[in-house]
């Protein structure tokens, strides 16, 4: 199983929310099943995401690449520092990250 493949599948068949503000909001409310944060995301954003995700019992996966690489992987012409998986759709991304 490949993270890139499963992430694209989740984007196509599920509900994926991009952006740090929305990701933090979903972490606060417990509205995400998984949060992915880029390795080089700003420290303040990462701290908020990890804090609220822990309170809401949401797993956080740190993407090994940069926010530019994460945006490119998703086919977006902009950087993506973090994203929230609300519905994985047909992807198996939740199982991949739990390993």
Swiss-Prot record:
Q: Which gene encodes it?
A: rpl30e
PROSITE patterns per the UniProt record, alphabetical: RIBOSOMAL_L30E_1, RIBOSOMAL_L30E_2
Recorded source organism is Pyrococcus horikoshii (strain ATCC 700860 / DSM 12428 / JCM 9974 / NBRC 100139 / OT-3)
Q: Which HAMAP family does UniProt cross-reference here? A: Ribosomal_eL30
Keyword set includes Ribosomal protein: yes
Q: Name one GO molecular function term.
A: RNA binding
Q: Which family does it belong to?
A: Belongs to the eukaryotic ribosomal protein eL30 family.
* UniProt cross-references to InterPro entries, sorted A to Z: Ribosomal_eL30, Ribosomal_eL30-like, Ribosomal_eL30-like_sf, Ribosomal_eL30_CS, Ribosomal_eL8/eL30/eS12/Gad45
Name the record gives this protein? Large ribosomal subunit protein eL30
Which Gene Ontology cellular component annotation is one that this UniProt entry carries? cytosolic large ribosomal subunit
Q: Name one GO biological process term.
A: translation
For this protein, the record's Gene3D superfamilies field holds: 3.30.1330.30
Which residue stretches, if any, does this entry annotate as coiled coil?
A: none
The alphabetical list of record keywords is: Ribonucleoprotein, Ribosomal protein
